[in-house]
Amino acid sequence: MSQAALNARERAAEKNAARRSNGSQLAGVIFLLMVLGTILWGGWVVIGWMKDANRLPLSKLVVTGERHYTTNDDIRQAILALGAPGTFMTQDVNIIQQQIERLPWIQQASVRKQWPDELKIHLVEYVPFARWNDLHMIDEQGRSFSVPSERMGKQVLPLLYGPEGSERDVLEGYRAINKVLAANKYQLKMVAMSARHSWQLALDNDVRLELGRSDRMGRLQRFIELYPMLQQQPDKRVSYIDLRYDTGASVGWAPVFIDNQGGEPPINGQQNSNP
């Protein structure tokens, strides 16, 4: 066979191979497009299925954590305030968390979903340490919050008063004062700090102490030394002790009623003394 014939045959074979290669590539591209189309269509169907409110609705609620003031209905109403709950796939738990943490006695909430239809919520409530300005509470860190009064029951807490934003200062003062009084067998009931940082106390026997703005602890020590002598006064009960002096104190006496066994009218005595 001549060289020309051989060359022609080789060129024909190369053309046939090229056509087969192009056909294979085209078939591969078509197959890839079909696969991608199937995936996209399947994803669209799944997304539509997940968004369907009748598919995987969040129908179970589990609330955990130590609770003293929070009811299941509180949580349920907080969630419903956002509208109808979403499905397992569409509901944003961060929104629910923020909504629950709006309850003024909730310190922290964590929310998560559990397959297939459960919403789990863990709560951390504020723990009241004292009452603040009658309307609120503060915790051990001096953070102010509120609890519905009907849910507090008969819980007895210290009474603290002060300007807005002074919670931590008043709490720190209460702790320092209470430590000294408790060591001397006195029970502190109330602490108030005015806008001018003047301090007033009340003991559990309703004796009121005026400490003023300076030398708070020194004046408190003066009360501890003075009060036992005042208690020895016959037929008298201390109402208040004003310690806002460099030395001594001003004492107010409360009315005392004596048992009327001799037919005499009750004695209603009150006087001030300056030791």
Curated annotation (Swiss-Prot):
Keywords: Cell cycle, Cell division, Cell inner membrane, Cell membrane, Membrane, Transmembrane, Transmembrane helix. InterPro entries: Cell_div_FtsQ/DivIB_C, FtsQ, FtsQ_C_sf, POTRA, POTRA_FtsQ_type. Residues 1-28 are cytoplasmic. The chain crosses the membrane at residues 29-49. It is found in: Cell inner membrane. Residues 56-126 form the POTRA domain. Its main location: membrane. It is a single-pass type II membrane protein. GO terms for biological process: division septum assembly; FtsZ-dependent cytokinesis. It comes from the Bacteria. Residues 50-275 are periplasmic. PROSITE patterns: POTRA (PS51779). Essential cell division protein. May link together the upstream cell division proteins, which are predominantly cytoplasmic, with the downstream cell division proteins, which are predominantly periplasmic. May control correct divisome assembly. Belongs to the FtsQ/DivIB family. FtsQ subfamily. Part of a complex composed of FtsB, FtsL and FtsQ. This is Cell division protein FtsQ. The gene is ftsQ.
